[in-house]
Amino acid sequence: MFKAELSDSSILKTSFDAISSIVDEVQIQTDSEGMRLDALDRSHITFVHLELKASLFDEYVCDVPEKINIDTGEFMSVLKRAKSQDRVIMSLDEGNFIITFEGDATRTFKIRLIDIEYDNPTPPELEHPASFKVHFGILKDAINDIDIFSDKIALQVDEDYFRASADGEFGDASVKYLHGENINTQEKSLFSLDKIREMLKADKFSEEAEIGLGTDMPLKLTLNMVTGDGKLSFLLAPRLESDE
């Protein structure tokens, strides 16, 4: 038996708003400790990991481990129907992923499970030379500022500042943020702005983002719930000069 109840749908909505932009299908794995997924987009550019602990849920039961293969777009379409005051209940029944919203009315949706062979991707083990935290709102504003002039963004960090910049045909833009971390190196990488924008759709998961950065290395973006009950993280491959 699997059953998970949440009094607030926002964590699921914000998580799968990002995830559904990156991958079409996922396998959600459940056990007594909670729900999690690992997925890699078709172009092998973005890796995503989601972990929701059993303690996050108002009620959580998973007697035996389950593998739930679903279409992320269909799941997101259902989640968009949740009202702010609705309780969300997830369960399984005869090849269906059941999502029920309980509020002024009880609404039930059945998503057919996908019969696919799913190889769970494993992320590379990376040690980024620089790791630091930034307020999510500052990061999102920086991306929106850069978006004016270019479809790619340079992220760099040194002893004092985290910088985002772009050089476009019609103009340039740059944003810098005093990070306040103990960093003794200078690192810089170039990334697709569209790919970063997909990740930043998870803007309600956490108020703070942890960034791992290294020269010509994948970007690591980690969002941790302040309660410690959930984590959403991404790895984004860099755009090398030879890609231009």
UniProtKB/Swiss-Prot annotation:
GO molecular function: DNA binding; DNA polymerase processivity factor activity
InterPro entries: DNA_clamp_sf, Pr_cel_nuc_antig, Pr_cel_nuc_antig_CS, Pr_cel_nuc_antig_N
UniProt keyword Protease, yes or no: no
An annotated GO BP: leading strand elongation
PROSITE patterns: PCNA_1
Keywords on record: DNA replication, DNA-binding
Source species, domain of life: Archaea
Signal peptide segment: none
Function: Sliding clamp subunit that acts as a moving platform for DNA processing. Responsible for tethering the catalytic subunit of DNA polymerase and other proteins to DNA during high-speed replication.
HAMAP family on file: DNApol_clamp_arch
Family according to the record: Belongs to the PCNA family.
Database matches in NCBIfam families: pcna, PRK01115.1-5
Subunit structure: Homotrimer. The subunits circularize to form a toroid; DNA passes through its center. Replication factor C (RFC) is required to load the toroid on the DNA.
Protein name: DNA polymerase sliding clamp
Encoding gene, per UniProt annotation: pcn
